[in-house]
Amino acid sequence: PLRFYFHSVARLEADDEIAEEVDAPMFGTILHAAVQKLYARIVGELHPGETLRTMLRTGEVAAAVEAAINENYLRDTAATAEDYTGNLLLVKDIVTRYLRGGVMPYDAAHDAFTVTGLEQEVAYGFDFASAGRPLRMKFAGIADRIDALDDGTLRVVDYKTGAPHLEFAGVESLFRGE
């Protein structure tokens, strides 16, 4: 009741504060924003391996991670890495290494695909029967990335970031849900 009063009657809002530590959801937000900045460039590009390799050779990955941190965590697009605390420098390094050492080299080496969507809402109805009655269940969510493979397969990519430990076990672990 008191929260309702402050929010709806008195129109008071809690100040937006920046937490001292980057929690798992914010880590995921930073990673997803960086991937979106980088991969937006290759949406619709057939066999984007060379473009990805070019991004890896230049400073584009680090710049995308910094932009994602500035927009989503610091909420200051003019900030630079010199403004980062030790914890934020660590997050920047982990996200950059995750992209430069895993996701992007893997995609560059296995580039028989075309990115068709980023952060796209998807929904799928699944029909089944239970106790002789036809039922329908809807699965819905946001796909981090959707690729059309050369063989006609549609691939939905989910960057796993919600685990409490932020370790990268290898590219294959991305596809096992680890």
PLM features per residue range, with description:
Residues 1-2, 19-30, 57-65, 69, ...:
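Secondary-structure capping and boundary motifs in well-ordered enzyme cores
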Residues 1-41:
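C-terminal, charged and often intrinsically disordered regions of DNA end-processing helicases
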Residues 2-13, 69-74, 154-170:
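Active-site-adjacent bridging/hinge elements
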Residues 15-16, 48, 174:
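Residue-level signature of transmembrane alpha-helix interfaces in integral membrane proteins
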Residues 31, 111-117, 134, 145, ...:
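Conserved helicase NTPase motor core
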Residues 34-119, 123-129:
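A non-catalytic, helix-rich entry segment at domain boundaries
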Residues 122-178:
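Mg2+/Mn2+-dependent nuclease catalytic core
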